[in-house]
């Protein structure tokens, strides 16, 4: 797999050797606090920050024939197309930084890289018509400068199509596919193949994700206009139309009221609660192959790091007793921006299981992120994640007779929530 594209950002390991933890020499004044020695970061974050720095430097000295800063420009998707290249096959340290215990790429770090790349592209698209001072704040990409801000509004469903090996070169290809008046949708594809030319092969795409950013005036909070997009190729036009349809659907859902339960759904609600009441009222007679939803909960508190996936993975692991395998994360809406230094509380639980497929039972995990401010006694929900896992086949093969337990609700509120998620 080659990285010859002029818009390809190569990733290098951040340590010189497994025993040398001194970060590579560079101008630390150009990096935010989160990238100083001792702070958490992935190698991609460093590479992307360097790329952002070049964007901002070019804006400080615009060419004489540059259009006025207030003028909206029209760009093509190819103008924003950017590639991140991971030379796993030749960089041992980089491999170890991304390797999980099962010799695959750590999905949690990869999701962070996707978020960082999408944020960089959104800045590039928006800042082409601005030379304002800019500051980048990490996870959940709350990007802002003096007068305007870019916020991650939502992430569409992310599906892992095949395992991602840590021994084979990897790349992420991303570009803007749709622009509204104040919204940007960016599509990212994670590509991995033993072949060098993999761009045209659908089989090489391991994961696809779509990030939606919105531009806001920092003073008024109102929508801020952004550069227009003009798709050229048939594929670009198709992606634009599909994104436009998704945007219209999101608007329709936001404007809709909560539906009342129909008669058939009341029966489902009663069925979900029936077994849970036995656990509450007659625990000695309860089904040993089932468990109450509240008994699957885990919780973690930390200072703003992208750990929702890691907590979901841990929840699935402790629930199943075998190594879980990630399948997908559902659409995510970011209700509140999260800044570096914010105190986050992550709460997770197994919401429900799907046991109809014996060879591939499904574990549905909910992770709720709360932004907590003890000084003002405030706790707000930032966003809610829904992850889907199964059990690794090789782990299940080593445990004959393995069977996942059924998760049942104990309250009507829990039962309604499960039904809402099943219908989502």
Write out the residue ranges for each language-model feature:
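Active-site helix/loop of acyl-thioester processing domains in fatty-acid/polyketide metabolism
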Residues: 105-146, 300-324
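Short amphipathic
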Residues: 75, 79-91, 294-303
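A cross-kingdom feature marking solvent-exposed beta-strand/loop segments within repeated
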Residues: 131-137, 143-171, 196, 321-342, ...
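HotDog/MaoC-like acyl-thioester-processing domains
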Residues: 2-62, 165-171, 175-264, 340, ...
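Alpha-helical transmembrane segments and their membrane-interface boundaries
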Residues: 90-101, 304, 319
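Extended repeat-based solenoid scaffolds, especially LRR ectodomains
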Residues: 246-297
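N-terminal, polar/charged subdomain of small-to-medium soluble alpha/beta proteins
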Residues: 30-33, 67-73, 77, 325
